[in-house]
Amino acid sequence: SKVIGIDLGTTNSXVAVMEG
């Protein structure tokens, strides 16, 4: 999830970390 969030963008990165 973290990698996906970072790949999409900084904003989504935070969401990915929360989901992960």
From Swiss-Prot:
SUPFAM superfamilies given in the database record: Actin-like ATPase domain
Pfam family membership, one: HSP70
Single GO MF annotation: ATP binding
Task performed by this protein: Acts as a chaperone.
Family assignment from sequence similarity: Belongs to the heat shock protein 70 family.
Name recorded for this polypeptide: Chaperone protein DnaK
Domain of life, per lineage: Bacteria
The entry's keywords: ATP-binding, Chaperone, Nucleotide-binding, Stress response
InterPro entries: ATPase_NBD, Heat_shock_70_CS, Hsp_70_fam
Upregulating conditions: By stress conditions e.g. heat shock.
